[in-house]
Amino acid sequence: MENILAMQIVGAITVLIGLRMNVDPVGLNKDIFGDVEGVDSGEMSASRLAIGGGIMALGLLNIYCSLNLDEGPATETVLIGTVIGLATFFVTIASAKFRGFTSEIPKLPMIVLPTLIAICLYSAMG
């Protein structure tokens, strides 16, 4: 897979995820945690907005770089940097269960994030 295409795929998906977090943070919180106490609080929604903004930023950086860089070492560097960011996000989400903050790990990020990481690694290393 070409690096530019991988950056655009990962960029588009992460922008959509970030938008979902920002458009309906309360709904997303309820999807993840159920109807628990505080799920619709302003603080929890504000946290979701900030997390979504970070994910959107990562996606927009990938899209921007895919449009402004030529295929080569620079695009590989962007993809490996994206892997580092996504892996950090993945570990942070998973650690919530192991640290006792949640009773289960949300399924969607445990599927989407490794898939995006695999796309980046496959393209950068290929």
Feature roles, as predicted:
Residues M1-T14, V39-E43:
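Cytosolic juxtamembrane helix and N-cap/initiation of the first transmembrane helix
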Residues P25-M44:
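Cytosolic, membrane-interface loops and tails of multi-pass inner-membrane proteins
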Residues I9-D31:
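N-terminal signal-anchor/start-transfer transmembrane helix
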Residues V78-I93, V112-C120:
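Hydrophobic alpha-helical membrane segments
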Residues L16, G42-L67, V83-T88:
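Core segments of alpha-helical transmembrane spans in multipass integral membrane proteins
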Residues I4, T75-V78, F101-M110:
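Non-cytosolic membrane-interface motifs at loop->transmembrane helix junctions
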Residues F90-L108, A124-G126:
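Membrane-helix boundary connector in multi-pass membrane proteins
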Residues M56-G59, I117-G126:
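Hydrophobic alpha-helical transmembrane segments in multi-pass integral membrane proteins
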